[in-house]
Amino acid sequence: MLFFQQSDFLDRDNLPDFLNRRGLKGYGVEVGTHRGDYAKVILEKWEGRRLDCIDPWENSDAYKDQAVSLWGGARNREEDYDAAFKNLNGFGERVRLIRDYSPQAANKYQNNSLDFVYIDGDHKQVAVACDLWAWYPKLKTGGILAGHDIVCPGELPDKNWGKEIQPAVLEFCKMFNTTCYLIVESLCLPWSYYFIRS
């Protein structure tokens, strides 16, 4: 089986329109909301009822390691939470900010209850694998499990997250015998991906 195929749309900013076309307009989750920038894009375009934004917004050792890789140093996570609140406050009851770690948060949702989940949290391989396994059962049949930063190892040497995320996604594809659709974005690279729950 061919595990990776190119998506029929470009750029993750078009994911909300894709969800709308598929009639996925109920409940969604974003894991790793950070400052709320992508959650805002989702909420502006997606016709769904509510998006839960999950992020611990705390300075863990794992976060500090990623922060050095992404921004050259650690950031104040409380400032990130405040920015997310400011970015998303105008959406009212369509959004909830939930301070929690992803696998623990997933346990609070019923199986077969969500239309989509977008994963952009901890980029370490084991964490990505845990997120995929934790959230996949929460999707309705036909729901979308998507994520960010699957850039192929070596394509952007100064950004090391692809070497962690891609193996976790490939293993997940093999275990579920499913196709991963790659969403081409900037630099003609597949930054985002998604699965359709069968």
Residue ranges of each PLM-predicted region?
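S-adenosylmethionine/decaboxylated-SAM
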Residues: 2, 6-8, 12-198
